[in-house]
């Protein structure tokens, strides 16, 4: 009986269960154990085997059957042959060369040396087989060799993984794309031209001054000639010189007055300091061409003279003024008032404008607690900060710590934000307050953009970027203070950071941790961080009246538009409006409707200025929401839930809350991730209402009933970690060396099922081995700031030699925005332009064609306009692609190009083989594994083609579950790229099978 057969029988009798993997696991433990008690200890550490006398007896019997030499009183040293064999085995493991027992019998076999405790004769080494003879291994030897080969292969992969990580860390400083370094290089290139301009300007200023000096000198000489030498006898030459100087002086003065005398139009260089042209060189406008000039007045007089006037009959009748009525109206009832916490005098916009930056900083509520805050940070390592949005905690607290000397020794102060917009806008504001250029002392770091330098001491970043910094700096050695801001939002990355920074704080006593929250759940954070103290900062909030609708609204978008017009017509100015919507599409719909209605009403209403703000909006357009509102106008800010806490907008007195937001949810059973519009929580509703009382008493109009608020809204939002796919997070934690994910210190642990699915997906992608350890492929995947499927697609492009095309496709997919746009007035032209890029291979190749054509046009904006392509989306795709190309070199992938679309689609399938659908006999697409019904997206170029097999980027749920960005593939490719995941019978195509050629029976035959 072989050893594994013995283990299998014993486990059935002792534990009641056994399979091949458990037998191999116990066999491997027995091989590593030195004795039976040692084996019992290893089984106890495994935790799956109850230690009992039966287990101890099993360990004794198993160790007696193991092929090993017994220890004796006289130990002999290894022979030369044994040393050579050991060295050969070591080298084979290092290079990954594994023995194959299924090879030809003519190969020499290394026979395993055995030891027996009872026989002295067996102490002699077993000789290796002679080259001419064949030794047939037993089943036990085959099993042992398979395990050894697998273990050696895993060890070699781990060694390669560690070597790759070391090389990546070594290249980190040189290969990271940095905005400030690029700017410095550009400045060096421009130094020569700028110096030339400065010299030219300096020369002009010198010539002006020299002209005045020389003129005064000449006047003095002429004056001396007239007074000193008028009565003297002079030579003919001296008289000519005096006459010459006199003429030069006259001509010079006449030249200076030439512009005034002749009124000649000529170019004059403006003054360098004021940039204004002197008044004596500005010509008067001709009045005949001005409204109200002499010509216009003459025309009015002639027209009046030609018309018949009847005296009092022509007098203007005073029209009766009526109140402007709207066709639609939303009825509200006032339910309650949110009390204020600070009854300060409301400052006007003019008064705020007069305030300097320093005065503005001192006017914030947090300024009164500056000294107490610094003392609290010095006294405690972890501090929970509770302060309302607008109190100044995000912009001021890092500055206070910097001024208190927490950046000494080259350390930094970091502050995380859940959104890119918040990180960029806050960093820009702090840079203005510090008085430096953005990217020097104050910088930011977001996905695909790093605006920092070696001088940066205050660094704002997204929480995802701080997670990526853990890969290269697991102990955050360059930071003295780390502030996790907006902790109440409970984003996926923020929850992971809680566990990581809590662990770091235990062995880095010099690291200060600040956890900032804007809601009243600070006690939960305090208890998670070992009862850390809470530092409360009272906000500056005024009373807010809460209004609910009398009945539920069927269309909250239309109700929001009507409510905006109601407020604008009935509420006094000044007072801006903040509207919370779910996404870019709704924001653009409301913006367009407001512009149309304002245009239709014309001068009957005051000016209404709709301003959008969402993540994909360019920063220059986002900044418009912070600009002062013009006089006799009202600003309407259309925002996503980013305006709840991340951004503070002054001048808001009215808030419209439809009660909805977009939220990701992951279905663990089907493996599908949805983006749903869901109701907000009560905590979020109160945050939205509080925005109306930021600068003065305000009103909040909730587009739902008071009953719905009380019974349908949850108290707190569900943390993102409990409702999203954890594949990227698990890969990141594995890269950081955190293997026990079940016992990881989560603030709210994720569902066990979701965690298991993430591990299964990473194992299927090849990022993890069967021991749950990160592979070399997984370490390379972790370097890309993408989801695991996209990272695998990029790495698979190395095999198919099409990395240039794959990074282009990945960049276009990463933008999360529409590439094409369809103006309502030009729908036919827009659709025709889009079809010009279509490829029969699918949407992925179509996206690649769009980028390549734009690149051929030298990245022209005009080309985008002519082809109805979003220029903003294309610019972002170019930035993403540039960084992905840099990361290819970092993970040692050579950039190659290929025009073969089959290779490109195979690389896509290698990453997204999870997302494969098959057309069934009913004409519907169903996923291969879960038989989940999906539908082609109407904007897909394959919408009318219906290929048999397709791979898609993601599922988007609106009215149905649509496949976004799909491409046609062949079923055989799945066995090529994922033979471990798909079986041949799953990929059989029933349409290709022929029916048997059997003849049917006639009616007469049936009657018989």
Swiss-Prot record:
Effect of inactivating the gene: Embryonic lethal. Defects in oocytogenesis and spermatogenesis. Approximately 80% of mutants have an abnormal somatic gonad and no vulva.
Ranges of residues in domain Helicase C-terminal: 563-737
One Pfam family named in its UniProt record: HA2_N
Location of this chain's protein in the cell: Nucleus
Annotated transmembrane regions: none
Role noted for this protein: ATP-binding RNA helicase involved in pre-mRNA splicing. Operates during embryogenesis.
Assembly and binders: Interacts with mep-1 and smn-1.
Official protein name in the record: Probable pre-mRNA-splicing factor ATP-dependent RNA helicase mog-4
Organism of origin: Caenorhabditis elegans
Annotated gene: mog-4
